[in-house]
């Protein structure tokens, strides 16, 4: 599973860049340079996803648009969304039992304000029939 969302970058008349996310109309930002615009895009995506999780607003799967930039949110948000998507409609109680932990501890795995350990993520992935895979970009 991949948690990168497509964003269009448009060069503005004043030599800055405007960034707009295809899947979130409320998520847009800008930057004076391409590097700054991409950094700001990751920040605004992280904030948007955090807000949607906190408010219980549905989060769409990333659209597949080859010609747009793919932007990833923070690792904490990615981890929370990956666990959420892998768990799907299974109750937290089932995940908690598989992890031999409490229901609140299992629920925290889907909270981007908490920092699960790699061991917790590996165990959650295994309990959900998945494998944890990491990469640097």
Regions found by a protein language model. Give the residues of each.
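Central "turn" residue of the DNA-binding helix-turn-helix
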Residues: 100, 111-112, 129
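A short, Lys/Arg-rich alpha-helix, primarily the initiator
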Residues: 64-89
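Alpha-helical DNA-recognition elements
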Residues: 108, 112, 123
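DNA-contacting interfaces and partner/effector-binding or oligomerization modules
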Residues: 1-49, 53-54
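Residues that mark the N-terminal boundary/hinge immediately upstream of a DNA-recognition element
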Residues: 33, 91-92, 117-120
């Amino acid at each position: 599973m991949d948690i990168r969302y497509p964003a269009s970058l448009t060069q503005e008349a004043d030599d800055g860049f405007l960034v707009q996310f295809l899947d979130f109309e409320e998520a847009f930002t800008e930057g004076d340079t391409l590097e700054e615009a991409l950094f700001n895009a990751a920040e605004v995506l992280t904030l948007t996803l955090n807000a949607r999780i906190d408010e219980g607003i549905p989060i769409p799967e990333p659209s597949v648009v080859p010609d747009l930039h793919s932007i990833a949110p923070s690792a904490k948000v990615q981890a929370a969304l990956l666990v959420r998507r892998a768990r799907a409609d299974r109750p937290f109680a089932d995940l908690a039992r598989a992890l031999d932990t409490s229901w609140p501890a299992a629920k925290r795995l889907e909270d981007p304000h908490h920092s699960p350990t790699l061991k917790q993520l590996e165990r959650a992935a295994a309990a959900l029939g998945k494998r944890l895979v990491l990469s640097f970009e």
